[in-house]
């Protein structure tokens, strides 16, 4: 296992056995988007762009707790759809979520994105949403995504811009520094970097950016977010980090902590 810090975001053992043993940490980070103004429904945006039709084969690589699989189910996608994740805990959460919404359950596989157990040209549409920054060798994963996506099919990769949650990261960085910790959270692989890696591999790469903001009304959602981060794992007193973070938030009555959100997707063909 890697040393604590930014490297934990791509440490397979840590991710599988600690960070994503269940979907609790991921769900905590997902929950802050309830405070997004104006709201961006990224799942709908991505699937509207992809427009899967009829009986296309869809694979969600790094499916996490199954948000996109569940959305496919809600849309009554008629073709086969598959979720792949290296974490059994994530797959359990994905199965439960999809089972709550879909008329049928997706197939689910435990596998690494750099060695997918799929034949060449197996999928019509491949999703890789907010997962490449968890891969130690993103170029190798991109080669696999290219391999399993049929000629004429589409790959959609989701990543974040360099300014995504910048205000939150600034506050967390200052709080960690105040207790002598150097574990500044950062985007390990950004939207710009992903685009640079994908363009030599695909004939066409179209970028879509979705910029908004969070208006966080108090310390609770910030505290939940901080608890979910790898950077706070192994800290003897994580609550001291949370206290240091929340002490830096606006303290005026009714004042919200405003945080930039900048997600995007790259549609590759």
Put a short name on every predicted segment:
Residues 124-137:
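A short SAM/SAH-binding and catalytic strip from SAM-dependent methyltransferases
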